[in-house]
Regions:
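RNase H-like polynucleotidyl transferase catalytic core
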Residues: 1-8, 96-100, 114-133, 149-152
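Basic, flexible linker segments flanking DNA-binding modules
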Residues: 1-31, 127, 182-190
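Active-site beta-loop-alpha junctions of metal-dependent nucleic acid enzymes
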Residues: 48, 67-89
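C-terminal domain-tail junction helix/linker
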Residues: 114-118, 140-193
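An active-site-proximal beta-strand-loop segment
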Residues: 29-64, 70-72
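Cysteine/selenocysteine-centered motifs that mediate thiol-based redox chemistry or coordinate metal-sulfur cofactors
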Residues: 91-105
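Mobile genetic element proteins and their domesticated derivatives, centered on retroelements
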Residues: 23, 39, 55, 61, ...
């Protein structure tokens, strides 16, 4: 006769803390730079596997910042957000919605968001629908670009990401949420009214 030990369950640092879901699947917004969503995905290459991280403006579905790196670090996230802030005029009620990954919940990221007056919103654990805009982007970008070919290294992934995001997705890809306009067309319509 032998005893069966219960399996140890690892608890993440922030699992029991209250991390607010401010966005609460309310993706609609009437103007740019009110609600941003962010996440990262894994892309295989022959030499090194890399991560693509993006920030999408919920208003137009435009990718306003993106970055590729072989490592997921909090500094990587800070640089991504900093890049978005350099490109866009934001207000004090901007919401950045992410998952609860360790990079997003890190001290470095929280310390960067606070002085920039960005309200950080988090998806519920194991609930990707809370970040549906970003998850949808990754679904289609993998289907339309990354899963259709093999990449040798990070430079090939960067080139493919640039061509897909800047040359197709932001400029030409229609979205039903934008009345079938591209993200750039939606923002142009807003700023020329």
């Amino acid at each position: 006769m032998s005893a069966v030990k219960p399996k140890f369950r690892y608890r993440k640092k922030f699992e029991n803390q209250q991390l607010p879901n401010i966005l609460d699947q309310q993706f609609f917004t009437e103007q740019p730079n009110r609600k941003w969503t962010s996440d990262m995905t894994f892309i295989r290459t022959i030499t090194v596997n890399v991560y693509l991280d993006i920030i999408i403006d919920a208003f137009s579905r435009k990718i306003i910042s993106w970055k590729i790196s072989p490592r997921m670090t909090s500094q990587f996230i800070v640089e991504l957000i900093s890049n978005a802030l350099r490109k866009r005029k934001t207000s004090s009620n901007l919401i950045l919605h992410t998952d609860r990954g360790s990079q997003y919940t890190s001290h470095a990221v929280r310390q960067f968001l606070y002085p920039n007056q960005i309200n950080h919103s988090f998806s519920k654990i194991g609930y990707p629908w809370d970040n549906a805009i970003t998850e949808s982007f990754f679904k289609y970008t993998k289907k339309e670009e990354y899963n259709r070919r093999k990449f040798h290294d990070i430079s090939e992934v960067r080139k493919a990401a640039f061509n897909y995001i800047e040359g197709f997705y932001n400029t030409r890809r229609p979205h039903s949420a934008n009345k079938f306009m591209s993200p750039n067309q939606k923002e142009l319509e807003f700023y020329t009214q």
